[in-house]
Amino acid sequence: MVEADHPGKLFIGGLNRETNEKMLKAVFGKHGPISEVLLIKDRTSKSRGFAFITFENPADAKNAAKDMNGKSLHGKAIKVEQAKKPSFQSGGRRRPPASSRNRSPSGSLRSARGSRGGTRGWLPSQEGHLDDGGYTPDLKMSYSRGLIPVKRGPSSRSGGPPPKKSAPSAVARSNSWMGSQGPMSQRRENYGVPPRRATISSWRNDRMSTRHDGYATNDGNHPSCQETRDYAPPSRGYAYRDNGHSNRDEHSSRGYRNHRSSRETRDYAPPSRGHAYRDYGHSRRDESYSRGYRNRRSSRETREYAPPSRGHGYRDYGHSRRHESYSRGYRNHPSSRETRDYAPPHRDYAYRDYGHSSWDEHSSRGYSYHDGYGEALGRDHSEHLSGSSYRDALQRYGTAHGAPPARGPRMSYGGSTCHAYSNTRDRYGRSWESYSSCGDFHYCDREHVCRKDQRNPPSLGRVLPDPREACGSSSYVASIVDGGESRSEKGDSSRY
């Protein structure tokens, strides 16, 4: 049974678009006093063709409906009927008018139709309409719309396809993101160290002296034993030369990244022809020089710098040493051989520098900046001396170090004071004099090597190089025998 919304409320539909509230009030006011006229308009403020009129007296409303229904108003036939509440019956599936937001005459009209079609219920005006309290068929539409979400809602709540799809996609996205992040992070890790290393190595290489053209060995790596060995002079019966001391050298090199391996020092050993020291010392110097920066040059590199002169083996020696010690001034300690090399080896003394290599290297550990006495010598010779000038300098060194005698007692290269070397009579002569008051050296200081004073020459089995010669800070004396005179020269090796 249809329920009226408001007894005095009428729905007027089919109005002309040009009809306004004043016209409606003038026409319907004849039937009785009107409390409200509501013309439904669109957003552009144009009439949508229907309106609601409320009479103060319900009887007047009934009379107006009977009188005005089906009549023409402004050229169009209008429909007037009692406004009714919209029905909630599911059977009535009439499509409400597009204007469902506000109370609309079409709503009441359709409601009336619904009532004729057998619809049983109406929505209360409070529920179905806005402020005006009139009916609107739109409520049914809104209700149907509500049903649609209700139907869809359960599927979504129950985890329908859309949620499922979205969830996997999210998971996939997260997985892909994680995957991409993982590789990216790995890439970052892999590429971090090499550049640094590259920069560090390049820095080291740059700091290396220009004398050595990129012969530096691996950074922080000691040259392989084979590498140093390859350069060792062929032994002619001096089998023991480096063998005995090589171990020490190697140990010392192990202790410090900067120390060369024993073999490396070995490589610089002179070829035992009597002039081995020359090349040997020289190459040593260069090597230690290059090594001054954790980069160590191959023995070959140092070797290339060795002067080939046979007669002045010692000179070249000291000279090369100096350079080497210079290079080592940076963190590199001259190998024991390095310092040793500066001593003039005698032809007969196979052990010549080989024995000393280990000691020199140990001494090099004690102090980083001072290479063998050769550093001072090498510097003086390399920078200031050439040809015969070497001899002079070496002779001067001889006074401090003493000339290397041929077969006599071997000269000890140790000595707290480099000036203690006075006896240099035989140069290549028959007896070796102790170069320094200290044959055995102890390295206490980077700058200064503490040694025990040994005035006596070391036994043939072992000759200990003067750590001061190897690392002496204040002066280096190289003994060189040339023409029967011993020459000594003081060099300041503590420049670094």
Curated annotation (Swiss-Prot):
Biased segments, Polar residues type: 175-184
A Pfam family assignment: RRM_1
One BP term from GO: mRNA processing
GO CC, any one term: nucleoplasm
Alphabetized GO MF terms: RNA binding
Tissue: Testis-specific.
Bias-annotated ranges (Low complexity): 97-114, 149-159
Biased composition (Basic and acidic residues): 204-214, 242-253, 276-289, 313-326, 335-348, 484-496
Region (Disordered): 67-348, 453-496
Transferase found in the keyword field: no
Keywords linked to the UniProt accession: mRNA processing, mRNA splicing, Nucleus, RNA-binding
Annotated ranges, domain RRM: 8-85
Chief location of this protein within or outside the cell: nucleus
Domain of life: Eukaryota
Subcellular location, record wording: Nucleus
InterPro entries per the UniProt record, alphabetical: Nucleotide-bd_a/b_plait_sf (IPR012677), RBD_domain_sf (IPR035979), RBM (IPR050441), RBM1CTR (IPR012604), RRM_dom (IPR000504)
Tagged with keyword Nucleus: yes
Other facts: The RBMY1 proteins are encoded by repeated regions of the Y chromosome, mostly within the AZFb region. The exact number of functional copies is unclear and may vary between individuals, and some of them may represent pseudogenes. The proteins are very similar, which makes the characterization of each protein difficult. Thus, most experiments do not discriminate between the different members. One can therefore suppose that reported interactions with a RBMY1 protein involve all the proteins.
Role this protein plays: RNA-binding protein which may be involved in spermatogenesis. Required for sperm development, possibly by participating in pre-mRNA splicing in the testis.
Binding partners and assembly: Interacts with splicing factor proteins SFRS3/SRP20, TRA2B/SFRS10, KHDRBS1/SAM68 and KHDRBS3.
Official protein name in the record: RNA-binding motif protein, Y chromosome, family 1 member E
